[in-house]
Amino acid sequence: MKIPKEGDFITIQSYKHDGNLHRTWRDTMVLKTNENSIIGVNDHTLVTESDDRRWVTREPAIVYFHKKFWFNIIAMIREEGVSYYCNLASPFVLDNEALKYIDYDLDVKVFKDGEKKLLDVEEYERHRRNMHYPKEIDHILKENVKILVDWINNEKGPFSKEYVEIWYNRYHQLKK
C-alpha cells in the first residue's frame, strides 16, 4: 500500500498472536506519516470486535503507531483531561487493506493525574502459554514496557504536553 497522506482515512486491524482478527477501527484520519510512524485520530469511530459486536468511540483520541517500537499509544481527549491507553503490540505493518499489528494483551493506562497502571497481566500470561509466545517475544515486550514507562516519566513523544494539542488542532484544521 502507498503511504497514506495527511487527511486520508485508513482502517486499523489488531490481531492476536495466533493470527485471529481481534478488533477493527474504521475510518481513522491520518494526521502525519513518515517512514517509521503514523499519527492519526479516531473521533466517533466505528469499532468491530472479533465476535462482531460493534461500538463507536466516545471521545476523540490521537493514535500513535511505530515500526520499531512494540507498543502503540492512544491519547484519549476528555473534558477533564487527557488519559492514555498504551497497547503492548508488534510494530505495525501497512498493506492495501489496513494498518495491522499483533496485540500482546499487556496494556499501560496513564490517568490524567499521571498515575500509571499495568493492565491485563493475567490475560497476557494465559495467552503466552496457550498461544506459545516465543521467549524472544516475551523479552521484547518486557523491554518495551521499560521504554514506554521512560517515555511516560520523561514526557517524550505522545506524552509531551504539546503533542495532543498540536495534533488535535491539526485534526480540526483538516476536518473543515
Swiss-Prot record:
Q: What is the lineage of its organism?
A: Bacteria, Bacillati, Bacillota, Bacilli, Lactobacillales
Q: Where does Mg(2+) 1 bind?
A: N87, D103, D107
Residues annotated to bind Mg(2+) 2: D105, D107, D120, E123
Membership in a protein family:
Belongs to the Ntdp family.
Q: Entry's SUPFAM superfamilies?
A: FomD-like (SSF159234)
Listed under catalytic activity are: a ribonucleoside 5'-triphosphate + H2O = a ribonucleoside 5'-diphosphate + phosphate + H(+); a ribonucleoside 5'-diphosphate + H2O = a ribonucleoside 5'-phosphate + phosphate + H(+)
> Known EC number(s)?
3.6.1.15, 3.6.1.6
Active site (catalytic residues): R23
Q: Broadest EC class?
A: hydrolase
As cofactor, the record names: Mg(2+)
Function of the protein? Has nucleoside phosphatase activity towards nucleoside triphosphates and nucleoside diphosphates.
Q: Which UniProt keywords apply?
A: Hydrolase, Magnesium, Metal-binding
Q: Check the record and name the InterPro entries matching this protein.
A: DUF402, FomD-like_sf, Ntdp-like, SA1684
Organism encoding this protein: Lactococcus lactis subsp. cremoris (strain MG1363)
Domain of life (superkingdom): Bacteria
Q: What name goes with this protein?
A: Nucleoside triphosphate/diphosphate phosphatase
> What GO molecular function annotations does the UniProt record carry, in alphabetical order?
magnesium ion binding; nucleoside diphosphate phosphatase activity; ribonucleoside triphosphate phosphatase activity
